Amino acid sequence: MLSAFVLLLACLGLGVGVARYARPPIGLAQALNWWVIQIALPALVLGIVPSLHFDTALWFLVVTQWGVFFGAWALIAWVGARAHWSRGTIGGLILVTGLGNTSFLGYPLLEALRGRAGLQLGVVADQLGCFIMLAVGGVLVAARYGGATVTPTEMLRRVLLFPAFIALVVGVIVGQLGGWPDMLATMLDRFALTLVPLALFSVGLRFKLKPQPGQWAPVALALSWKLLLAPLLALGLALLTGVGGAVMSIGILQTAMAPMISAAILADQHYLDPPLANTVLGVGILLSLITVPLWSLALP
């Protein structure tokens, strides 16, 4: 787990340092974001999905991730309308508030806090819960709040042509056919390994640890939902439905993870207040290193 944290902080810090003390080429962050969304993220999905197995008894892991996303959408849209936030701000906040870092931060945290068995359950929540929300819900939010009015047909087209969604469909088919040959699996893994360092470096290029004037309220709302309110609601759902044990604990811990890196990248690509989205992401990652272990201590 320590090595994963060091990588996260090093890549983020390197981006901050380059932005402050070097002269990065114009458009560097956008170029890195293109690679992350078009190449690295689909490669990750293509590598993981074929080996994923789902049991209906694990529904809680999936539904809680969907609930985090739609709950964030409802909350941010309602508050944003009354606070007169711009459409870009609302859309960017929905993305980073509704989608969690359930893989690159979630996997090492779960393995450290709950062992290998906890990690296996966490993969289900990540791939079938949070990732599907990125591939479908995230694209819908980006289309709706990204500027010009988009027809339902155009929204559907964007979802179906989103590279990671295509990778999800292909991955399911490949899984039914027995998986990838070893050489292709290794190649996909190598491409996927570029996602975390490049994405965090890109975020670091625009990262501001201290929110700018006017950002305090949106940042506080976003992280209150992501790190506190969403896990509490997931706990309430578990108590109401009788879900317990490891499934309950892992489901709640995955709802409590920091904002998703790829969500901030998506916000950047669609001009959904990138400075705010990156601030929520960076501050959320740092705070979650404290709040997630506290949640783990509180859960059975």
Predicted regions and their residues:
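Alpha-helical transmembrane segments of multi-pass small-molecule/ion transporters
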Residues: 1-300
